[in-house]
Each structure stands twice: as C-alpha cells, then as structure tokens.
Amino acid sequence: MVAVSGTQRTRTVSLARWAVYAGSVFAGAWLATQLFYLAQIALWLFVNPGSTAFMRTDAWWLSRDTPPAQIRHQWVPYDQISRNLKRALIASEDSTFATNNGYDVDAILQAWEKNKARGRIVAGGSTITQQLARNLFLSREKSYIRKGQELIITWMLETVLDKERIFEIYLNSVEWGRGVYGAEAAARYYYKIPASRLGAWQSARLAVMLPKPRWFDAHRGSAYQAQRAAVIARRMGAAELPQSE
C-alpha cells in the first residue's frame, strides 16, 4: 500500500475545491444567461425587439466593409403583413407551426442522421420558433452547444409568447439578404411595395430565399427559385396560420 503524503493530500483537496468553485462559477454564469434571455422574451410581451443578434453582427460587418451601407429594417404590425407571405413561410419552413410546441422531432432526428453521415453539422431541422431563437440571441455558428442553447430558448419563447406573437417577431426579424431584415424591408427591397401588398407568387419567391438569403439575393431569378416557388405556391392553400388569423 502506497502512503499518501500530507502535501499530496493537501494538493488534492485544493484541486477539488478549485474544481467545485469553477463549476459553481460556470453554473452561475449559465443560469444568469438563461434568466437574461427569459427576461428579454417576457419584455416582448409588451414591446417589440429593437434588433437581433444577427442584425447587430451584420451591422458591424457592413460598417467595416461598406461604411455607407445600413441595415434595412422596418417593424410593421402583424395585420399589416400579407397573409400570402404568412402562408408561404409556413408552407416552406414549418408546416405544423400553428400546432407544434416549437420542435419537430422527426426533422431533428433526420438532421442528426444527416450530420452523422457527413461527419459535420450540415442540417438543423429547425422550426420557425427555433429559427427565431437563433436569430434573436445566437450566432450563425453551427455547433451542438449552440443547438442546445437554441432548444432552450425555443422552450422559453413557446412558454411565454403565443403563436401569433412568435410569428409576428419572426416576420419582422428574419433575414432576406445582406442587411435586409423583416417582411417590410424585403418587400420594399425586392418589389418596391409594402409587405401588406405582397401577392402569392411574390411571397412564394421570398419564402424560397430563407435558407440561403444572401445567395438568392446574389442569384435572383434562378431556375431553382422559380421551381421551388411553384411548389410552395401549391402548398400555401393548406398552410394553417395561428388560430387568431
């Protein structure tokens, strides 16, 4: 049997104490971050978000790369956004949005299998609420840690806000090209009209852009966009909007 010296025992105890201390600090910081997110979401019951994490990051890059350029963004109330666009986004991004709890388990499992096969994260299986969680608070980085945080924020959004409010914030904050955020800015940028006047075909084409808005902004009128828009347009009639609609 090997004897343990007093010095070794003291060092072991010190390391254990530091580990407990570091763990406590980390846990406290993590909890404070979650409470900050929750408080922000609760505030949005009464006021509209001024900006999102994506907007702030984009604004920084624009100011560095093209100083005169600014973020295009104008908040408009839910009832001033075309029903065509609402239906197009649900048909394209999250067909069960009106009834799900913010998660699509089948889509998440499919994304997991796809990522495992590729050996890296290439898909996320995100619902509209998950996309909103990411846009509001997180970054474009693809990692399992970020995905875990996204799922927690999604639960907060679904718990605190109703579906119409979630969709209203999403419609006003989603990216439609570099520096273009929200339905009103997108409608005016691409079609020179307010979001309230978007037709079915225009809405379907905007919906196609969401997975890769910057790519589609640079490749407007592509054959794929037209083909995909036709598919979305056919599905729009069956898209279920939040109940108050």
Swiss-Prot record:
Membrane topology value: Single-pass membrane protein
Residues annotated as transmembrane: 20-42
Function as written in the Swiss-Prot or TrEMBL entry: Peptidoglycan polymerase that catalyzes glycan chain elongation from lipid-linked precursors.
Residues in coiled coil: none
PANTHER family found in the cross-reference section: BIOSYNTHETIC PEPTIDOGLYCAN TRANSGLYCOSYLASE (PTHR30400:SF0), MONOFUNCTIONAL BIOSYNTHETIC PEPTIDOGLYCAN TRANSGLYCOSYLASE (PTHR30400)
Matching SUPFAM superfamilies: Lysozyme-like
A Gene Ontology BP annotation from the UniProt entry: peptidoglycan biosynthetic process
A GO-annotated cellular component: peptidoglycan-based cell wall
Organism the protein comes from: Burkholderia cenocepacia (strain HI2424)
Example GO molecular function: peptidoglycan glycosyltransferase activity
Source superkingdom: Bacteria
Pathway: Cell wall biogenesis; peptidoglycan biosynthesis
Alphabetical UniProt keywords: Cell inner membrane, Cell membrane, Cell shape, Cell wall biogenesis/degradation, Glycosyltransferase, Membrane, Peptidoglycan synthesis, Transferase, Transmembrane, Transmembrane helix
Subcellular locations according to the entry: Cell inner membrane
EC assignment: 2.4.99.28
Catalytic activity, reaction form: [GlcNAc-(1->4)-Mur2Ac(oyl-L-Ala-gamma-D-Glu-L-Lys-D-Ala-D-Ala)](n)-di-trans,octa-cis-undecaprenyl diphosphate + beta-D-GlcNAc-(1->4)-Mur2Ac(oyl-L-Ala-gamma-D-Glu-L-Lys-D-Ala-D-Ala)-di-trans,octa-cis-undecaprenyl diphosphate = [GlcNAc-(1->4)-Mur2Ac(oyl-L-Ala-gamma-D-Glu-L-Lys-D-Ala-D-Ala)](n+1)-di-trans,octa-cis-undecaprenyl diphosphate + di-trans,octa-cis-undecaprenyl diphosphate + H(+)
Family: Belongs to the glycosyltransferase 51 family.
Principal location listed in the UniProt entry: membrane
UniProt xrefs under Pfam families: Transgly
Protein name per Swiss-Prot or TrEMBL: Biosynthetic peptidoglycan transglycosylase
